[in-house]
Amino acid sequence: MLWMKSWFETRWRFLFVLGFAAFQLINVVHHNVPDQPFAVAKLVYPMSFFITIIGIMLGGAGINTQVAFRAIKGLHGSMYFTLALPVSRYRLLATRAATGVLELTAVIMLLCAGLWTTVPQLRALMTLPEMLVYGFALSVSAASFYSVSVLLATFLDGQWQIWGSMIFVLGMQEVSERLPVPHPLDLFRPLTTDSPLATHVLPWSGMGISVVLAAILFCLSMKIVQLREY
């Protein structure tokens, strides 16, 4: 029941992100010249931007109604239904966050499979399983940005949550470019220069840092959820 409720409250953002992924795929295919060598860098950086955006969008969908903070316009029945459920806020938030992670992973995997299928040069560079491993690395590396969006969604609504997440992530990127951030602590490297698409090696340190940071941010989100009144 909770999983179905999470899906109903996130499905429109998921479908929008899926359409965004289709546009990204069409754009890559349109600008690709099959007879020329494939420039990996031209794909890695747009992909990192795309992954960050969809992580932010999927992270905040349905958080407030899922944990019954307030009745948002058009979702009043959802809030009252949530209040009637004999479940804890921790379970509500965990289910909602897990739903978003699954949606994020699904979009990334579909995009990677689509790129491998439609770009001949990629098929020459790697196999489909290797491309899906690249998608897995992207999903794990995006977990920290996703968790930032979840955290902000616990006390911000709609567009404020999206803009707040974008400003925070852009600020992190600016700091990583201007300050000597240690290589393993740079959250953007696994999506760009250390991407398996370029190195053919999984960025284990970057992925590990992303998972640890995501866990910390989720714990903070849970604390906020437990302290909020409705």
Would you name each region that the model predicts?
Residues 1-21:
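Aromatic- and glycine-rich beta-strand/loop motifs that create alpha-glucan
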